Swiss-Prot record:
The reversible ADP-ribosylation of Arg-102 inactivates the nitrogenase reductase and regulates nitrogenase activity. It comes from Rhizobium etli. The key enzymatic reactions in nitrogen fixation are catalyzed by the nitrogenase complex, which has 2 components: the iron protein and the molybdenum-iron protein. Binds 1 [4Fe-4S] cluster per dimer. This is Nitrogenase iron protein. The lineage of its organism: Bacteria, Pseudomonadati, Pseudomonadota, Alphaproteobacteria, Hyphomicrobiales.
Amino acid sequence: MSDLRQIAFYGKGGIGKSTTSQNTLAALVDLGQKILIVGCDPKADSTRLILNAKAQDTVLHLAAQEGSVEDLELEDVLKAGYKGIKCVESGGPEPGVGCAGRGVITSINFLEENGAYDDVDYVSYDVLGDVVCGGFAMPIRENKAQEIYIVMSGEMMALYAANNIAKGILKYAHSGGVRLGGLICNERQTDRELDLSEALAARLNSKLIHFVPRDNIVQHAELRKMTVIQYAPDSKQAGEYRALAEKIHANSGQGTIPTPITMEELEDMLLDFGIMKSDEQMLAELQAKESAVVAAQ
């Protein structure tokens, strides 16, 4: 158990976090690692590409059916997928009712008590990261996840979420062993995306672990409920995920305590990269358009 690496993938909704994590973990198992995935996203889509199936039944859903979590057996919630990867989805309540983080807390406690963490090299938490509320921060707060990898892109809200997640890590870094492992950029083909990702990583006292290029083969594999590693193992994109997996595998003990920036500093960075226009630029453009309209009359 001393060699167990507990990693977590955080990122804003829709960033491709679950797809990136599952492809990376499929590549890690190909390196001979034994893996347990704990899905901590209410969408419960953290394991479907590994299981080649629709979203699996969640711990909270099964507990509600049986009466309580104490009535469940480990085999009820744990399914084996690609090359023996163990998969669990914590789940969440009905929309608008209760705290979605409660499922995370309930699941992790149940799994630990029932020996799910025995005989694995990696436990990977796939966590929603738009908001780092108490429940979703649980893998960080309770000193479970030791290495956090933030999946982001060059889009403003993805950068904003990455900075917020870094704030959550910083809050618990001194009381526990949690560290920021690095950023993973899931390309959205925005302007100067690689440069911007590297710059944000540097500002956060971290590094860009890997830049994952955009490729439609990812969607083709997803439609078949498969990772690219399984669907097209010889493809260039599969090679990208293998490179990412190797970098994470080599990154043990190299995490850092992040240095999040303010919203103003983030906006200044976007201005420096020409991604966002200043008020003066926008006003000048508006005046130029108005002048052109007047001149045309």
